């Protein structure tokens, strides 16, 4: 009880950061749901085109998002050390870095026709998908601006703008989809491609909202963000890239793992694919909580280290683990006991419900491993340690997790082929290995920081 009383203040700070981030993440998921519903009501071809287009767009933008995420711990370090004069420069250098990568993303998306040719899709399907990508690509500059400014605000422990502007984006998204998908109010009827145009408008709306807030908020006036425009400093730009690129790749390894499994189980039939998708959809929704805790602990750890308090950094980690562990335990129990009921919300098909319920039982364990690895990697980002976590994530997800899943799911080498359940055991194995390896890495990094801080105290005392 005494331990809790002493540390309640830090827990409250962590919770206050986590809440708005969670709501912001959920609004982004809801935008995707709106796209899916609007396109689905238009037709199966439009829905499929939006799905494939999104599968190209999202991985393409991970590089920008990863670089922007690097700004949060960098700025939180500066905030903790009261180095506020350097924040305006690092914000602008981060914008340069993300802008460069944004151009690369646009160039990469130009390969979409080639990818669709390899897939040998129908002409109508190809046309809608390419139109979707054409329209949504206009939103990439807005996405760059929004991502940079969002992480600037969050780096200063101000997460409310993410929440409010997330709602603004959702409020723009619903009518914009309705207008452009169905051709209302004199606008052309674009079908699934209209979702791309709506998303581009949303991204620009969120970017402009974030610009207005950032450069008019009284709390940022002392930072003098517009007093001087800094030229690109390649040392600072490469510094952001050096921290952010491994974050981007870690995200890519995780996203691509789930995409690869979806392709591998596709030949097992629609029942298996549908059950897998239901379990994955629910798990993805649940993951928003540990993801938000992870992003919040990055900020608290970065601030503590900037303030020269490595012990408080590890306290934030322990409290995040406590918070995440309780959530994972309760949520895992709900998923295990109520898996069938949750699956029935998606479909009336008994075969799909039964298989999904089995997968949900595995997803309950998966959630625990996922929570611990997410919080560990978020804490390491607070230490600005991203290179080795990227390597550990790759080893855990691909050579280990996917291999275990493939052997158990599609071969008889160990047990009779388990289908989708085998791949979910692979997910659990990979994420559990990641959680252990990342925890060991964190232990090493945190001790190094504590030794360094101790030596600095001795030197200052001398």
From Swiss-Prot:
InterPro entries listed in its UniProt record: MATE_fam (IPR002528), MATE_MdtK (IPR050222), MdtK-like (IPR048279)
The UniProt keyword set, sorted, is: Antiport, Cell inner membrane, Cell membrane, Ion transport, Membrane, Transmembrane, Transmembrane helix, Transport
The main location class comes to membrane
One GO term under biological process is: monoatomic ion transport
| Annotated membrane topology | Multi-pass membrane protein
Key word 4Fe-4S present: no
Known Pfam families for this protein? Answer: MatE
GO cellular component assignments: plasma membrane
Q: Where in the cell is it found?
A: Cell inner membrane
Per the record's keyword annotation, is rRNA-binding included, yes or no? no
Membrane-spanning residues where? 56-78, 90-112, 127-149, 161-183, 193-215, 243-265, 285-307, 319-341, 356-378, 391-410, 420-442
Gene Ontology MF, one: antiporter activity
What the protein does comes down to: Multidrug efflux pump.
Task: Please report which protein family the annotation says this sequence is part of.
Answer: Belongs to the multi antimicrobial extrusion (MATE) (TC 2.A.66.1) family.
Protein's name in the database: Probable multidrug resistance protein NorM
Organism encoding this protein: Idiomarina loihiensis (strain ATCC BAA-735 / DSM 15497 / L2-TR)
Upper classification of the source organism reads: Bacteria, Pseudomonadati, Pseudomonadota, Gammaproteobacteria, Alteromonadales
């Amino acid at each position: 009880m005494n331990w809790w009383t002493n540390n309640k203040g830090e827990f409250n700070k962590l919770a206050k950061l986590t809440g708005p981030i969670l709501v912001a993440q959920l609004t982004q998921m809801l935008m995707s749901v709106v796209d899916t519903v609007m396109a689905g009501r238009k037709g199966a071809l439009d829905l499929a085109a939006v799905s494939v287009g999104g599968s190209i767009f999202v991985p393409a933008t991970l590089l920008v998002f990863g670089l922007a995420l690097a700004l949060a711990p960098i700025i939180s370090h500066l905030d903790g050390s009261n180095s506020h004069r350097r924040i305006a420069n690092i914000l602008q250098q981060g914008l340069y870095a993300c802008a460069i990568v944004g151009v690369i993303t646009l160039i990469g998306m130009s390969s979409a026709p080639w990818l669709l040719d390899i897939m040998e899709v129908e002409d109508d399907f190809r046309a809608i998908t390419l139109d979707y990508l054409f329209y949504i690509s206009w939103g990439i500059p807005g996405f760059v601006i929004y991502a940079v400014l969002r992480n600037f605000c969050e780096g200063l422990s101000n997460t409310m703008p993410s929440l409010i502007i997330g709602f603004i984006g959702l409020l723009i998204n619903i009518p914009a989809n309705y207008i452009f998908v169905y051709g209302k109010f004199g606008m052309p009827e674009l079908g699934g491609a209209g979702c791309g145009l709506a998303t581009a408008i949303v991204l620009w709306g969120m970017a402009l909202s974030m610009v207005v807030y950032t450069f008019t908020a009284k709390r940022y006036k002392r930072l003098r963000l517009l007093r001087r425009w800094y030229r690109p400093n390649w040392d600072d730009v490469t510094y952001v890239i050096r921290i952010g690129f491994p974050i981007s790749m870690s995200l890519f390894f995780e996203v691509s793992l789930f995409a690869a499994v979806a392709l591998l189980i596709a030949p097992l039939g629609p029942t298996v694919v549908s059950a897998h998708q239901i379990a994955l959809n629910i798990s993805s929704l649940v993951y928003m909580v540990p993801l938000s805790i992870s992003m919040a602990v990055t900020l608290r750890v970065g601030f503590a280290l900037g303030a020269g308090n490595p012990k408080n950094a590890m306290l934030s980690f322990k409290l995040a683990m406590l918070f995440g562990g309780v959530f994972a335990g309760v949520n895992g129990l709900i998923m295990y006991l109520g898996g069938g009921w949750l699956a029935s919300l998606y479909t009336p098909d008994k075969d799909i419900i039964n298989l999904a319920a089995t997968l949900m039982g595995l997803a309950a364990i998966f959630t625990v491993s996922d929570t611990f690895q997410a919080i560990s990697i978020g804490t390491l980002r607070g230490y600005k340690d991203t290179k080795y976590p990227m390597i550990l994530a790759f080893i855990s997800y691909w050579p280990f997790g996917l291999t275990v899943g493939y052997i158990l799911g599609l071969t008889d080498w160990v047990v009779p082929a388990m289908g989708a359940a085998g791949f979910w055991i692979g997910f659990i194995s990979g994420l559990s290995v990641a959680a252990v390896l990342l925890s060991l890495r964190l232990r090493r990094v945190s001790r190094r920081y504590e030794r360094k801080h101790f030596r600095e105290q001795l030197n200052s005392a001398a």
